[in-house]
């Protein structure tokens, strides 16, 4: 069985009209393996107007 963790994803967006950076968006996902988190981050990074995606493993 794979270990499951809680990850926090930081997403940097660009406004499509002005080209300016929007405030970062944070998403919290639970019960994900490290590989699942990488796939999710890659999928987010391929979204239009996304500049970067960082993810952190939540520590208790």
Cite the ranges covered by each PLM segment.
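Short N-terminal "domain-start" leader segments
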Residues: 1-15, 55
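Generic short amphipathic/hydrophobic targeting helices enriched at N-termini
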Residues: 4-7, 30, 46-49
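Short linear motifs centered on Gly/Pro in flexible linkers and helix caps
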Residues: 11, 32, 42-45
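A short, exposed loop/beta-hairpin motif centered on an aromatic-Gly-Thr core
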Residues: 19-36
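Short, mixed-charge low-complexity intrinsically disordered segments
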Residues: 42-60
